[in-house]
Amino acid sequence: MTPGYRRDCVRQQTRSDDLTTTTPDRRAQILDSSAELFARKGVAGTTVRDIGEAAGVFSGSLYHYFKSKNAIVAELLADLMGDIAARFELIEATASSPVEIIRGLIRETLTVIELHPYATAIYQNDRNYLRAHELLEPVDRASRGIREHWLEAIRRGAEEGAFRVDIAPEIFYRTVRDTLWSTTHWPDRKQYTLAEFSELMTTLFFSGFCLVLDE
């Protein structure tokens, strides 16, 4: 057997494992490989062949698991938004006050960003592609539901005297949301553990930066 033929056999054997690996495991492998590629190269810059090579399957075999490249993108984003929604619902169901709800929403937002770094990058960096291929509306629809968790807690906190009433709930919500999601690009973010960074952000939003305010 020649070396070249042996390499071809090994490659064929490696990629044929998609026939023996369970479907859930194979789908997860494809999703993981695709997410990293999309985040690094952009969705438009990633080909089906790229995904197949990264996942260790023939590109034609991908269609047994996903109808298209965009179907993979849609599932990655759906997983991201579904995780956020589930975590927010749990916080809302278990927290004892609006302050604790907001504290929990801050913590869980940062948790999701850490658990889904590639999907987060896709959502932030590929919005034009997502919009052009009708992939953005499902995400925006889910975002509107998530937004209500924030606004309901902020309004309730203001009514109960826990939060200021001279700052519109929408302004506070957008400030917190945009700041949290932008932290993926902060070079000093990695200096803190998730718990430390969550507490730092909570302190900043709740207590501000001034030690003494001039009246």
Locations of the language-model features?
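Helix-loop "lid/cap" segments that line or gate small-molecule binding pockets
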Residues: 91, 107-114, 124-129, 204-208
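N-terminal intrinsically disordered/low-complexity leader segments
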Residues: 1-25, 32, 213-215
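Amphipathic alpha-helical packing segments from all-alpha helical-bundle domains
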Residues: 82-89, 115, 133-160, 170-174
